[in-house]
Design a protein with these regions (language model features):
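Conserved catalytic loop/helix region of short-chain dehydrogenase/reductase
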Residues: 1-3, 17, 41
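Catalytic tyrosine of NAD(P)H-dependent dehydrogenase/reductases that use a Tyr as the general acid/base
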Residues: 4, 12
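Active-site helix of classical SDR
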Residues: 7, 15
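Short, small/polar-rich loop/turn modules that mediate ligand/substrate recognition or access, typified
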Residues: 23, 28, 96-98
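Conserved SDR Rossmann-fold cofactor-binding beta-strand/turn motif
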Residues: 28-38, 89, 102-104
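A glycine/serine/threonine-rich, flexible loop-to-helix segment
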Residues: 37-69
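A conserved structural motif in NAD(P)-dependent oxidoreductases
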Residues: 57-58, 70-81, 92
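Short C-terminal tail/terminal secondary-structure segment
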Residues: 85-86, 97-110
Length: 110
């Protein structure tokens, strides 16, 4: 968990520092922070964690534990994230900089 949290905050700091450093060149720097996104890597991780007995509730897979912790009671799929990435790459976001958009089903407001 420590490495995960450190990397998330590293992305936030990089976004802020990049925005500060590049603003004078009229370059914007923003980011998005996805939560749990179901991909083949996530599906394998979920299976591996169940296989080694890592679960907080009896009979419940890690995927279910994460889903229960989200405000929106479902994990996301790549289709849920792509709109935010497209927005940030478009001219519609040209007046924002230094922002991190959390696309995490409410995880960060717990």
């Amino acid at each position: 968990v420590t490495v995960y949290c450190t990397s998330k905050y590293g992305c936030l700091a990089l976004t802020h520092c990049g925005a500060l450093g590049l603003a004078e060149h009229n370059i914007t720097v923003n980011g998005y922070a996805p939560g749990v996104v179901v991909t083949p890597l996530w599906e394998q991780l979920d299976k591996d964690l169940v296989d080694i007995g890592f679960k907080e509730k009896e009979g419940q897979a890690y995927d279910d534990i994460v889903r229960d912790a989200l405000q929106i009671k479902r994990v996301s799929y790549p289709k849920d994230i792509v709109g935010t990435a497209s927005f940030l790459a478009s001219d519609d976001s040209d007046y924002m900089t230094g922002q991190m958009i959390h696309v995490d089903g409410g995880w960060c407001i717990q």
